[in-house]
Amino acid sequence: LAKFILGNAIRDKAAQSPVARRVLWGLDLVFVGLLLGVFRVLPVAWASALGARLGRVFGRILKRRNRHVRANLSLALPDRSPAEIDALAGDVWANAGAVLAEYPNLYRIADPRREHLEIEIVERIPAYDAPDRPVVFVAAHMANWEIPAAAIARLGFRPRLMYAPLANPWLDRLILYYRA
């Protein structure tokens, strides 16, 4: 997430003023907290679909950020047409929205009594025979990057994760709460 969500236009002033920074952090916390609260009361599939829809909308509204996403996609995929890049940018924003909407539902997604998470082991994992021994799992960020840790835990391993904390420490604590 950005340093500020709602106050990005005045981030330079906020960088100079601890009071302004805290006010913007608080506004961001309230905004994201309300969104996550709505997503938490919805069924998982609905929350994810709504998050994807909102992600697409916000992607169009956040023009400067969308230009940045499009520029990165153009660099990574130089053979794609501008129309294809636009479509991919929309997909990037939809995925980001879906991931955000799934945060307050991670406990339901990971719950083995529900059918949200299917684990399929294609080849034998030698470390599976000794889950108390250290092993490194690597997962691609194809959709919700929090789900592989839940799958690993369901296999009997105790995952330890690395992440970069958010610039807003209050928002960071909220996201960590949902990750736990």
Regions found by a protein language model. Give the residues of each.
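Membrane-anchoring hydrophobic helices of lipid-metabolizing enzymes
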Residues: A2-A139, D172-Y178
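Catalytic core of membrane glycerolipid acyltransferases/transacylases, capturing the structured
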Residues: A98, P131-A180
